[in-house]
Amino acid sequence: MRLSNLIASASLLSAATLAAPANHEHKDKRAVVTTTVQKQTTIIVNGAASTPVAALEENAVVNSAPAAATSTTSSAASVATAAASSSENNSQVSAAASPASSSAATSTQSSSSSQASSSSSSGEDVSSFASGVRGITYTPYESSGACKSASEVASDLAQLTDFPVIRLYGTDCNQVENVFKAKASNQKVFLGIYYVDQIQDGVNTIKSAVESYGSWDDVTTVSIGNELVNGNQATPSQVGQYIDSGRSALKAAGYTGPVVSVDTFIAVINNPELCDYSDYMAVNAHAYFDKNTVAQDSGKWLLEQIQRVWTACDGKKNVVITESGWPSKGETYGVAVPSKENQKDAVSAITSSCGADTFLFTAFNDYWKADGAYGVEKYWGILSNE
């Protein structure tokens, strides 16, 4: 989800270690997801008969008003996609011909919830969510937006040991160090440098944590920024400059793995220049905001977006979904209905279709966020009780 105001004022930057970034939500994403369905094109599915799927209008604008979408018709479960590969991180960024299928979550969460903290134990078998996915996203903020303590982060991470990779968005709140100290020995981390005007500071923070509590082998990827183009915070060429700066600083610090800038799938489709900069395409995509997709079709929908991004990059870059999930609470949007049961079904569909290439969004409910349009922004926590 987009963290807006990425290039913050000095006063906000100085407060970064004390509070969560403001307006971390899907605000700009809602207005564009349905513009993906505008006309028909043809793709080849595993060498079989061609299948018509909806594609983007060539002149679509990222922040245009919502367009009425038509239902997609592709049988996407067999779409051939490639997973990201890295010689530095073979175990986590693996090359694959298509997303792997796996078992998915089958039970519902039933415990009562409390908004005193953004994390809560559901009593669910966490392994049912973690099986077959690349990882899960995590943010270290209290309900008030204040930073969680090291012990609180450790308590959260104790519930996430079955997830292969933990994705972080920034370096504030001492989160890199706290997660390194708390994660399981076999877990990896996908790190982020959120403030693009503080890249060197972010690299220094990461380097310190890595050298003190782990090694660069624990890091699968570093992202420079999150949804910069989708949020109108940078042009594609500026994103390229940020990635180059980050890659150089990280290399000097001893890291030689993948460097990316995460954006939305629609931003990449509308701005294929972005394909030139990241080592692989790291994109966020949420079927709920399509409004024409039910939770049970989330996996099929997500595969279609992977195919679109891969095609936009002329098949030259592998695609990893760095956020996808379903809200458990909020307003019905078209045929998309938030509920805990639908969240479970969406996670199951995503895991079965393309889990090996997907980070689930997110570990716990984010009560520190504003409700946002449709009232869903707080309620994406897969392990939370509501």
UniProtKB/Swiss-Prot annotation:
Domain of life of the organism encoding this protein: Eukaryota
GO cellular component terms listed in the entry, alphabetical order: cell surface; extracellular region; fungal-type cell wall; fungal-type vacuole; vacuole
PTM per Swiss-Prot/TrEMBL: N-glycosylated.
Places the protein is found: Secreted, Cell wall
Propiece span(s): 20-30
Positions annotated as active site in the UniProt record: 323
Family annotation (InterPro entries): Beta-glucan_modifiers, Glyco_hydro_17, Glycoside_hydrolase_SF
Principal localisation: secreted
Top-level EC class as recorded in UniProt: hydrolase
Signal peptide: 1-19
A Pfam family this chain is assigned to: Glyco_hydro_17
Family recorded in the similarity comment: Belongs to the glycosyl hydrolase 17 family.
Record's protein name: Probable family 17 glucosidase SCW4
Lineage of the organism: Eukaryota, Fungi, Dikarya, Ascomycota, Saccharomycotina
